[in-house]
């Protein structure tokens, strides 16, 4: 059997041409890659940021493939000490290779400081011994490209940010872009997917390719059990409804967020910590998981005084703007 992560890797586009969406970023990245190839140089260090599941890891692999080099994948939490970093830089990289660090904002501070000369001068300072007898030796490194990915760019320190020559933001995908990608996946996996069904899955995927691919697998499960070799619109709608996703892609947790904000806090403003406590979540989860998509839909606003529900949120939940149904047909402000 093929594990989902191996399946995702097999379906991952290898080139910028195969990659669907992020058109502005692709245009710029295409120029940078062509220039680097023409000069036979490593690509400038690149920082990719945006919500989870938008393709930062995929783009890192595409960069390596387009440059014809190897990629070494690690994550910020895995690099706690300078020794962890030294092992990666000295044992795993060859000239021009790509080092991809996911969640780079979680890189240990001491390790981060040792990364600066590696990024800037392609050298690594190693301290041998302790106390007065300690001495520093300088190890030359191959010229490599660091690709960092983060969902929290505000946590990237200024010294680290300044060492990236390319900094790009990934946007949410349209339903059409997601459908195009899902149709490709279905073709590669050998089952049918109607375009309307692809659009339906795309519309309920929170603009996120990773979620769309997960939903496609679940919808396919329902189709397989029903003995269907092609996923049509009705099957997609039925399966997605059973998965608890509404027409905008909101699940029960998203609705709980909005309903708590509206019913318990009169639509806001309310602080994120208070709201998190009310729905038994932590504030970081709200900020990283729930809120980006709700803001994208125009359902909430972040204000200096706290979170506020918009008229679109009331409308989506079937409530008149600014009012709350008390259960007796009376709307309270």
From Swiss-Prot:
Under the heading SMART domains, the entry gives:
AAA
User: Does Nucleotide-binding show up as a keyword for this record?
Assistant: yes
Question: What's its EC?
Answer: 3.6.4.-
Source species, domain of life: Bacteria
Reactions mediated catalytically: ATP + H2O = ADP + phosphate + H(+)
- Single Gene Ontology MF annotation: ATP hydrolysis activity
Under Pfam families, the record lists:
AAA_lid_4, RuvB_C, RuvB_N
Primary residence: cytoplasm
Which is one Gene Ontology cellular component term of this protein?
A: Holliday junction resolvase complex
Which residues lie within the region annotated Large ATPase domain (RuvB-L)?
1-173
User: Keyword Nucleotide-binding: yes or no?
Assistant: yes
Task: State its location(s).
Answer: Cytoplasm
Positions that bind ATP: 11-12, 53, 56-58, 120-122, 163, 173, 210
Which UniProt key words apply to this protein?
ATP-binding, Cytoplasm, DNA damage, DNA recombination, DNA repair, DNA-binding, Hydrolase, Nucleotide-binding
For this UniProt entry, which residues form the secretion signal?
none
**Binding positions for Mg(2+)?**
57
Q: How does it assemble?
A: Homohexamer. Forms an RuvA(8)-RuvB(12)-Holliday junction (HJ) complex. HJ DNA is sandwiched between 2 RuvA tetramers; dsDNA enters through RuvA and exits via RuvB. An RuvB hexamer assembles on each DNA strand where it exits the tetramer. Each RuvB hexamer is contacted by two RuvA subunits (via domain III) on 2 adjacent RuvB subunits; this complex drives branch migration. In the full resolvosome a probable DNA-RuvA(4)-RuvB(12)-RuvC(2) complex forms which resolves the HJ.
**Record's comment describing the protein's domains:** Has 3 domains, the large (RuvB-L) and small ATPase (RuvB-S) domains and the C-terminal head (RuvB-H) domain. The head domain binds DNA, while the ATPase domains jointly bind ATP, ADP or are empty depending on the state of the subunit in the translocation cycle. During a single DNA translocation step the structure of each domain remains the same, but their relative positions change.
UniProt function note = The RuvA-RuvB-RuvC complex processes Holliday junction (HJ) DNA during genetic recombination and DNA repair, while the RuvA-RuvB complex plays an important role in the rescue of blocked DNA replication forks via replication fork reversal (RFR). RuvA specifically binds to HJ cruciform DNA, conferring on it an open structure. The RuvB hexamer acts as an ATP-dependent pump, pulling dsDNA into and through the RuvAB complex. RuvB forms 2 homohexamers on either side of HJ DNA bound by 1 or 2 RuvA tetramers; 4 subunits per hexamer contact DNA at a time.
Instruction: Please give the family membership noted in the entry.
Output: Belongs to the RuvB family.
Protein known as: Holliday junction branch migration complex subunit RuvB
């Amino acid at each position: 059997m093929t594990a989902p992560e191996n399946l995702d890797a097999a379906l991952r586009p290898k080139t910028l041409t195969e990659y669907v969406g992020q058109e502005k970023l692709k245009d710029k990245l295409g120029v940078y890659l062509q220039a680097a190839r023409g000069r036979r140089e490593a690509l400038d260090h690149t920082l990719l940021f945006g919500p989870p599941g938008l393709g930062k890891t995929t783009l890192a692999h595409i960069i390596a493939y387009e440059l014809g080099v190897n990629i070494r994948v690690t994550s910020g939490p895995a690099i706690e000490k300078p020794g962890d970093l030294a092992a990666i830089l000295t044992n795993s990289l060859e000239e021009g290779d790509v080092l991809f660090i996911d969640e780079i904002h979680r890189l240990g501070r001491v390790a981060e400081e040792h990364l600066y000369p590696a990024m800037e001068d392609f050298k690594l300072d190693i301290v041998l011994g302790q106390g007065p007898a300690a001495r520093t030796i300088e190890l030359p490194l191959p010229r490599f490209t660091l690709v960092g990915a983060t969902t929290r760019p505000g946590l990237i320190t200024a010294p680290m940010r300044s060492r990236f020559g390319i900094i790009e933001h990934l946007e949410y995908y349209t339903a059409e872009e997601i459908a195009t990608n899902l149709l490709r996946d279905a073709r590669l996996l050998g089952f049918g997917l109607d375009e309307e069904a692809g659009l339906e899955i795309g519309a309920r995927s929170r603009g996120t390719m990773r979620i769309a691919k997960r939903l496609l697998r679940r919808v396919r499960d329902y189709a397989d059990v029903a003995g269907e070799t092609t996923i049509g619109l009705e099957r997609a709608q039925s399966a997605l409804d059973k998965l608890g996703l509404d027409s905008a892609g909101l699940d029960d947790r998203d609705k709980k967020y909005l309903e708590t904000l509206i019913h318990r806090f009169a639509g806001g403003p309310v602080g994120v910590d208070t709201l998190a406590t009310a729905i038994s979540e932590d504030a970081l989860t709200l900020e990283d998981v729930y809120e980006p998509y709700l803001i994208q839909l125009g359902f909430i606003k972040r204000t200096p005084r706290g979170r506020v529900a918009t008229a679109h949120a009331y409308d989506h939940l079937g409530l008149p703007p600014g009012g709350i149904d008390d259960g007796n047909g009376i709307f309270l402000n």
